[in-house]
Amino acid sequence: MFDSLAKAGKYLGQAAKLMIGMPDYDNYVEHMRVNHPDQTPMTYEEFFRERQDARYGGKGGARCC
């Protein structure tokens, strides 16, 4: 029973993070390990910045101020 509760908690936490736009670095690292073993994954800081730029148009995007 506790195993299924732990799994449910993990998925609910992941869903909540995705709803507020917080990227999931652990899933990214696992994806890179499985699908692109010859490439080095980004650091957490690089990953976070890349996701933030993709979401909010960071590089050269329009600014209000």
Curated annotation (Swiss-Prot):
InterPro entries: Sel_put. It comes from the Bacteria. To E.coli YjiX. This is Uncharacterized protein YbdD. It comes from Escherichia coli (strain K12).
